[in-house]
Regions:
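Short, low-complexity/basic segments of RNA/nucleic acid-handling proteins
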Residues: 1-189
Length: 190
């Protein structure tokens, strides 16, 4: 379960800032016991064109990610933002990517997943609001609910609505890394 501080911060993030993101480098089980940040290692191309180690912060593998996700999902359910079934589907999707592409692509998988929550959810939410407005003008209905937008957003993320996002940002890049056409560092940004 999230700590009191975590749920309070999450409430402010979701209700006041209209975001649905937390940093899994610090948002983890037993948040009040966190003494140091979780580290994730990747590689980047240096100014000389050679690969250099890159230290990113976040869960070092999908198992650690799932522990952080479970705290996030509990907070989402506590605040009635997203239903349990959709949150489980999202977690299983990320775990499937990790299983399909392996630890070699974990830094990229986590980067895309974190950016999805930080940046892409806002775009999806905006799209939902725009589609709803257009539907109303045309005398149609739309399932986006401005009073409770995050359910629709996560439904889109785990459904066909955002499959192109995952294909472009994650699947294609992981495939390029796994087939050794590209280096992981070409896609990882600090």
């Amino acid at each position: 379960d999230p700590t009191g501080d975590q749920i309070s911060a999450f409430y402010c993030i979701t209700m006041l800032m209209s975001l649905i993101n937390v940093d899994f480098a610090v948002w983890a089980p037993y948040g009040d016991r966190i003494a140091k940040r979780l580290k994730l290692l990747g590689r980047t191309i240096g100014a000389d064109g050679l690969l250099e180690p890159l230290e990113l912060f976040g869960p070092p593998n999908v198992k650690a990610w799932r522990l952080c996700w479970n705290v996030f999902a509990t907070a989402c359910r506590m605040l009635k933002l997203v239903d349990a079934e959709t949150l489980v589907m999202y977690a299983e999707m990320i775990e499937q990517y990790a299983n399909d592409f392996g630890q070699a692509c974990w830094a990229l998988i986590y980067q895309v997943e974190a950016r999805t929550r930080l940046e892409h959810t806002v775009r999806v939410k905006r799209r939902g609001a725009d589609e709803k407005e257009l539907a109303i003008r045309n005398g149609q209905v739309h399932s986006f609910d401005p009073a409770s937008p995050w359910q629709w957003v996560f439904d889109e993320l785990v459904g066909r609505g955002e499959s192109d996002w995952w294909r472009k940002e994650l699947e294609y890049k992981c495939f390029m890394v796994k087939t050794k056409v590209r280096e992981l560092g070409e896609y990882i940004e600090g």
